Structure formats: C-alpha cells, structure tokens
Amino acid sequence: MTRQRIAIDMDEVLADTLGAVVKAVNERADLNIKMESLNGKKLKHMIPEHEGLVMDILKEPGFFRNLDVMPHAQEVVKQLNEHYDIYIATAAMDVPTSFHDKYEWLLEYFPFLDPQHFVFCGRKNIILADYLIDDNPKQLEIFEGKSIMFTASHNVYEHRFERVSGWRDVKNYFNSIEK
C-alpha cells in the first residue's frame, strides 16, 4: 500500500525563526519586543522603520543554520516518518542565501529524513502531498491536499484551516486519523 505524504514547512513550524529574528532585532536596534506582543501581527508591521534590519538579519550567512528546533518537533516527525513519507517544503526564494544553511540545519536536526525529500520552493502548490503543515495561510490556501495550520503569532486570528498548536497537537491529529 502506498504511504501518504506529509509536507512540513520549516520556518515557524520546525524551526523557531521568529524567535531568533526578534532576539537579533532587539539586540541591534536596542528594542524590547516581546513575543506575546506579536499576536495577530507580523514583526515587519510593528517596526516598519526597521524592516531593512529584519531582511539584513535573514540574509546573514549562518542565520538559518543556528535556529532552535521547535519543542517536540524531532520526536514527532521521527514517529510520523515511520508511517508517512515526510517532505520538508520550505519557501527559500525570498532569501536565496538561506539554501545552504537550511539544508545543513535539516541534516543536523532531522538526520532520519531523506535529503531527497527536502524541497526548496516558493509557492507550495507545486507540492504533491496529502497534507501540508504550515504557518502561512497563503501557502495553505493554494495547497491542493489537506491544509493544517501550525499556530504562529501572525496567524492566531486565522480560522479557515484546521489548526495545530505545537508538535504534540500534530501527533494527536495524526494518531486520531489513523484509527
């Protein structure tokens, strides 16, 4: 029997990209932005005067290589990998300098995944999978399979998609549909 495919976004789903950006912005611009102040907002809209700084941080060599892994992501993805074909679908077109760092990060933190299943793309409607776990509503709305929204500060008021709030929720979601 053919295994179903799950495509998983990297930034804000597997990796805490926003936390690293906020930390760097706070240090460099002498600000005190708190993660909870971002609920329902994007960082670039909160500090439009520092939008260039945010992009500079994202373009720095090594930035994406040093991100923290989201809690429980490794263990849950490893368990899912036993029953599903897992693909990592990360939008890398906006920051082309991120390719190498993202690839190395995935190899380090998810060594049990097949690197041939790492997809660096722009729009995720090109991904042929049964499920997409992503924090970006724009990606989820163009995906042709089942869209699952991973909670992030910028999408808390989005209600069009089934939602998971962390990797334990992801595990529970897929455990419930296997029965």
UniProtKB/Swiss-Prot annotation:
Keywords: Hydrolase, Magnesium, Metal-binding. Mg(2+) binds at residues 9, 11, 135. The active site is at residues 9, 11. Pfam families: NT5C. It comes from the Bacteria. It is an enzyme of class 3 (hydrolase). Its cofactor is Mg(2+). InterPro entries: 5'(3')-deoxyribonucleotidase, HAD-like_sf, HAD_sf. One of its GO terms (molecular function) is 5'-nucleotidase activity. Its EC number is 3.1.3.-. GO terms for biological process: pyrimidine deoxyribonucleotide catabolic process. Belongs to the 5'(3')-deoxyribonucleotidase family. Dephosphorylates the 5' and 2'(3')-phosphates of deoxyribonucleotides. This is Putative 5'(3')-deoxyribonucleotidase. It comes from Staphylococcus epidermidis (strain ATCC 12228 / FDA PCI 1200).
